[in-house]
């Protein structure tokens, strides 16, 4: 960086530099091209702040939001003394407090977790965004003004730098989580609503309303005020260019087509992921419909297998016929990096593999959501070893491609391009599955740490905000520096802390309020349409209320406790579910005709706290009474294709209240025939008949 008189223009500076550096070119020691652009020249006049119409419009929008937030927070605080008489679920009250920093702040900092939540998703979500921010920070430092840039082509000699050079694989974790949560929430809705129908349009509208407000406000910030926050020789190159891109192409972002339309001038370069994820939601009914419609699952698994096959085939063929590298080899072949980015990296037809694996895993997790899955210890160890080997091979495998003596192999590149993303997310899927079913060990405990919960709630806003600080760092530089590991770590933690601070403000202002509004309006629409819903199935993402990978959505709950399974009577299994009074599934399992009914106990939750019931439920299904010695038949009664679960609120009237005790068993007679009696705090299901005394423990 040099200081010259302000009367000099950029062409004169370029001519002077060419004359000064010409001896180096003549002697052949340096082959260089001198280029000075008008944007790289800064003066006091050019740095003066000027606001145009777009700036004032955005400022006005911010002012309106600020007034709404102040009013909502004031109302919320004023009503705190009247909470006993105020219905917190009242639609009017919920909408009036949706922008309250008080309520939203409390919700953001909560660390309680629903008992059926998959806690490991909190850690996975936050650590993934940390990995992304680290990779982008390293990239920004390497692209900056450094004195030792000649060392960059040798980065791959250090194994640890592959976490940066191949760190783009981390985005597939979010595609996986998105598929998991979409499948799980739609499966829960399928069995929660008595007159369920697949509503693709509702899914699209919900997703759009869920993501767009915070996204649109960040696009507006890029296009207007961001440029006013600094200056420097590279400010126009980084921040100014993004301002221009966002003013020209904002509509491609809001329509979520920016990964196809005007890709080289994309507003917010990280936003390709949001477009790709939205497009995957648009395509998801291809798998979601057979998953939800055909309860036996055969057709779904057939469609899944075909989709998975094409997810490997398409990037394989594109890489093979275009002669591309297997991944983006950043500093080895810059032109090849651009081609891979345009033809494969940002294209939905090359990125849907992890997403459909997520859909399948979400389906499996829902089906086994309350079962005790027993896996032999050797299989568990083997699974962890294979998952670790696959994950490490995917991340560190391309290192050999960076060396100069590596000869390009079309088959090698095509195989890596086709398989590496699927292998990586399968390894992550194993971690999730094991953590859910008690085989996660220290990894599962670490990922399920409650400290991740508030941080994971900020993941989406952090993804939107983190580039603000990266672009600022690159644009403000006025002196050269050294590219060192410690310098990168220092920059990373600075960027991470600032990102989390800004993302908290962004989430409280533009994300959480619209999430509350969306949830409230959907719940009200369902009530008006007369939908009868089942009790909440337990939130897979309960701790973070996250419904979509790095995005959050909270499912509506209902006080209606009833459920009917209408499976094929000729089928070989049926689903039994037991609910507590809060409407949460206590356990769920498939009972096969050839199994002993006592094996139902093997499918229960092992945690005693998760088996406490406040009411007694009767499942109309049994056909054979039980004698004093045990079951009259070793088989489950065949007519288990139709099971009604009904809450008997007046069951206490049938009990002898004088002999009631919290810890003692009681006997009473039921007039119902062909029923199972579920006993509280016992894990037994007793078939009853007229005159048979069922046994109950009251809690």
Spans of model-derived segments:
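Exoplasmic/lumenal regions adjacent to the first transmembrane segment
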Residues: 1-123, 128, 135-171, 175, ...
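Intrinsically disordered, low-complexity regions enriched in proline, serine, glycine
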Residues: 11-14, 142-143, 184-186, 214-220, ...
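Generic alpha-helical transmembrane segments of integral inner-membrane proteins
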Residues: 67-70, 74, 130, 216, ...
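Helix-loop boundary elements of multi-pass alpha-helical membrane proteins
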Residues: 71-126, 184-213, 280-308, 360-389, ...
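Kinked, hydrophobic transmembrane alpha-helices enriched for aromatic residues
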Residues: 116-154, 161-183, 210-229, 255-258, ...
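Hydrophobic alpha-helical transmembrane segments of integral membrane proteins
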Residues: 122, 165, 171-172, 176, ...
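Aromatic-enriched alpha-helical transmembrane segments of multi-pass intramembrane proteins
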Residues: 248-275, 282-425, 487, 497
